[in-house]
């Protein structure tokens, strides 16, 4: 914790429960790899960003020279997924972190524009990628005005024009976002 600007430290034995299990290094690395793969669903077989060791199953992606590892549970869940769900990804989402993987699997070149000069921005200061099913379809440029208690949607940038059903799905997700944030949605 902190006390003003000073960090406070504590001994591990006073923070963690006494009956916590202890693992050897190999077992701890294996468990960490499984946890990483479960979180990501898919990872490069040998990746410096998300090392998963031998967790999951080896997978070959058509057209890719790289080998991947997949979480079998995530793979099985795809069978039950009707697809088409819309999600706004936080610009710092782990899915966006490995840019080469993102470009290879989704053909999506992502650039966080908050550090670009305003004149060079294409989508907005903190635009959120819009994932629809298994493809990136646009960017949401929105911000919360806490003083007004409102979600302001500056723009929805469509990579290709949305059909009416896709437009309705994105609008519904924006409404859900405003509700989740506990603010009203300004007309856009």
Question: Language-model segments: which ranges?
Answer:
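Long, charged, low-complexity, helical-prone intrinsically disordered regions
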Residues: 1-188
């Amino acid at each position: 914790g902190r006390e003003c600007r000073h960090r406070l430290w504590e001994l591990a034995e006073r923070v963690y429960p006494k009956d916590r299990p202890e693992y050897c290094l190999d077992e701890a690395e294996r468990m960490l790899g499984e946890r990483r793969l479960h979180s990501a669903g898919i990872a490069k077989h040998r990746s410096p960003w998300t090392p998963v060791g031998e967790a999951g199953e080896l997978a070959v992606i058509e057209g890719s020279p790289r080998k991947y590892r997949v979480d079998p549970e995530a793979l099985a869940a795809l069978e039950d997924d009707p697809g088409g769900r819309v999600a706004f990804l936080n610009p710092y989402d782990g899915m966006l972190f490995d840019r080469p993987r993102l470009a290879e699997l989704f053909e999506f070149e992502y650039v966080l524009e908050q550090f670009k000069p305003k004149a060079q921005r294409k989508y907005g200061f903190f635009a959120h990628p819009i994932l629809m099913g298994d493809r990136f379809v646009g960017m949401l440029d929105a911000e919360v005005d806490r003083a007004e208690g409102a979600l302001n949607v500056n723009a929805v940038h469509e990579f290709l024009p949305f059909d009416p059903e896709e437009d309705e799905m994105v609008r519904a997700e924006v409404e859900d976002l405003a509700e989740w944030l506990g603010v009203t949605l300004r007309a856009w």
